[in-house]
Amino acid sequence: MTMNIAKMIDHTLLKPEATEQQIVQLCTEAKQYGFASVCVNPTWVKTAARELSGTDVRVCTVIGFPLGATTPETKAFETTNAIENGAREVDMVINIGALKSGQDELVERDIRAVVEAAAGRALVKVIVETALLTDEEKVRACQLAVKAGADYVKTSTGFSGGGATVEDVALMRKTVGDRAGVKASGGVRDWKTAEAMINAGATRIGTSSGVAIVTGGTGRADY
């Protein structure tokens, strides 16, 4: 079971003060425990790709992070650049203000810009930032992500005060059905919480506590 859950973990280090040494350590841990990916900021993608060369651990990065308030064109460029540097998964933040303004067409275009830039070269996960949304907005965001061709919907950046909840994961799974994966992220620090998220429908876990989860401990960081 430990190895099964390891394959669902995006081993994450997104804090702005992360050093190269810490990124290398993250990659070493990912190789040791067999995590699905490492998730790092775009500036560290080349480093992670170098460290993980020849392994099946994928490099994941973030787009429009953490606010989601850049333009579709900017997010598309970030995506192309990240893939050129070695990323094989991208976690993008939706335009939250546009969603709340009822500008669904813009939200969909924003997601589609990243999906088209990834063009089958990288998985696209769409962060809806559940802590800032009503349930109706969460459903609408997930529907737009699926419509735009995203591979996953994801709960949180970990930078907006609230992380994944079992209720949100279940709602997102109900909304997307089998059309997309669901990634629970933010505040998942131990085995019990990770298991609860998976039971609610999560198929990927984003956490900086991956080692603690698979070794039975409890991590301290939010993300």
From Swiss-Prot:
<keyword id="KW-0704">Schiff base</keyword>
<dbReference type="GO" id="GO:0016052">
    <property type="term" value="P:carbohydrate catabolic process"/>
</dbReference>
<dbReference type="GO" id="GO:0009264">
    <property type="term" value="P:deoxyribonucleotide catabolic process"/>
</dbReference>
<dbReference type="GO" id="GO:0005737">
    <property type="term" value="C:cytoplasm"/>
</dbReference>
<keyword id="KW-0963">Cytoplasm</keyword>
<feature type="active site" description="Proton donor/acceptor">
    <location>
        <position position="183"/>
    </location>
</feature>
<dbReference type="InterPro" id="IPR028581">
    <property type="entry name" value="DeoC_typeI"/>
</dbReference>
<protein>
    <recommendedName>
        <fullName>Deoxyribose-phosphate aldolase</fullName>
        <ecNumber>4.1.2.4</ecNumber>
    </recommendedName>
</protein>
<keyword id="KW-0456">Lyase</keyword>
<feature type="active site" description="Schiff-base intermediate with acetaldehyde">
    <location>
        <position position="154"/>
    </location>
</feature>
<comment type="similarity">
    <text>Belongs to the DeoC/FbaB aldolase family. DeoC type 1 subfamily.</text>
</comment>
<dbReference type="GO" id="GO:0006018">
    <property type="term" value="P:2-deoxyribose 1-phosphate catabolic process"/>
</dbReference>
<comment type="pathway">
    <text>Carbohydrate degradation; 2-deoxy-D-ribose 1-phosphate degradation; D-glyceraldehyde 3-phosphate and acetaldehyde from 2-deoxy-alpha-D-ribose 1-phosphate: step 2/2.</text>
</comment>
<feature type="active site" description="Proton donor/acceptor">
    <location>
        <position position="91"/>
    </location>
</feature>
<comment type="function">
    <text>Catalyzes a reversible aldol reaction between acetaldehyde and D-glyceraldehyde 3-phosphate to generate 2-deoxy-D-ribose 5-phosphate.</text>
</comment>
<dbReference type="GO" id="GO:0004139">
    <property type="term" value="F:deoxyribose-phosphate aldolase activity"/>
</dbReference>
<dbReference type="InterPro" id="IPR002915">
    <property type="entry name" value="DeoC/FbaB/LacD_aldolase"/>
</dbReference>
<dbReference type="Pfam" id="PF01791">
    <property type="entry name" value="DeoC"/>
</dbReference>
<dbReference type="InterPro" id="IPR011343">
    <property type="entry name" value="DeoC"/>
</dbReference>
<dbReference type="InterPro" id="IPR013785">
    <property type="entry name" value="Aldolase_TIM"/>
</dbReference>
